[in-house]
């Protein structure tokens, strides 16, 4: 952890009504004496002149002083809030840097200091950047929930439960002469299953939080001429894909990135799936399957004029059987303007079924609402937290250790191996909040922040 005193502009570069210079570290009071001529009363707004060493006034504004550890970073912090012209702010930073021992902060270094001083855990620190970068009200609310500790609390609760179970297992190993066989009395198995269930719930919430932050990848797939490219154009609101009556027009992957009420959606149009002797079309079909395998959702596009079926297993069983397990599928029956079928939304064999006309736009708004719902859109903006890819990976790793531990217990009654899997699970979970985290990971996370944050 650095003991340097750092300084940076905390507001965005450019012209604005107010500009803020932030100083954090032991020399913050020295800066106050040099620039203001006094140290402001802690946590009180002080309207004063910001002066050169000669006494010439650079600007007038509000000075705020926070005595550590009662500050954002846990150190002494001075904020100078002046007028937002970039020249004025540059002059003020130049003046502050005349105090010996200061340096310009690196991106994210104020948040990193807060993390190092236990003012924030890692998920809360990341939530600051996510709140700044939020592209929707839902993303902003979820990031704020993470900043306030909702995600951290759930992870800490899991760590505590895993730790307690590990201690119980190790006690059973250390005292083998006790009359009760702790490994087979059912208590450990019940506790382990309870933890696995809770972790499953956190994983589901985290995946939803990741979609809110990073967007959902939706692949439009189906046979040639089902209307896949027309649907891409309808969702994107522009002519992104060429649409013709010729089967196999789309031979490569087409991508569109759109926002539905601010929520990011990555739409992938793919080549029509069929057996073909055309070499180029074969390559396009393989690329289509590559996209399907990494999708969050598949829109199974069906030409409604070719079949009345709504159950995807009946429409094309080979396609459904080839899909990855747990990949969500929405059946989209296209060309409702020609079939005359009702636009009702139904569920068949566990899959949502939508009737639309990609050409005329009938039913497309309902499909958009469906996609928003899948991404976690909530009109009341209550609940949920933001999550990143690294959080999902850590949760997956923790889950795998729990399942391995369960196998060691149920199949082999191997208490030592169960205890080791619980220890590995504990470490994986603790990486989320930064309890056990490499310096390389910390550097990567905080370097993506804004300077001054």
From Swiss-Prot:
Transmembrane helix is among the record's keywords: no
EC number: 3.6.-.-
Coiled-coil residues: none
GO biological process, one term: tRNA methylation
Annotated binding of (6S)-5-formyl-5,6,7,8-tetrahydrofolate, by residue: 22, 79, 119, 453
PROSITE patterns xref list: G_TRME
Domain TrmE-type G: 215-376
Note describing how the cofactor binds: Binds 1 potassium ion per subunit.
A Pfam family annotated for this UniProt entry: MMR_HSR1
Location, primary (coarse class): cytoplasm
Class of enzymatic activity (EC top level): hydrolase
Binding positions for K(+) per the UniProt entry: 225, 244, 246, 249
Alphabetic keyword roster: Cytoplasm, GTP-binding, Hydrolase, Magnesium, Metal-binding, Nucleotide-binding, Potassium, tRNA processing
CC cofactor: K(+)
Residues that coordinate or bind Mg(2+): 229, 250
Compartment(s) of residence: Cytoplasm
Residues that coordinate or bind GTP: 225-230, 244-250, 269-272, 334-337
NCBIfam families (alphabetical): mnmE_trmE_thdF, PRK05291.1-3, small_GTP
Name assigned to this protein: tRNA modification GTPase MnmE
Native organism taxonomy: Bacteria, Pseudomonadati, Pseudomonadota, Gammaproteobacteria, Alteromonadales
Gene name of the record: mnmE
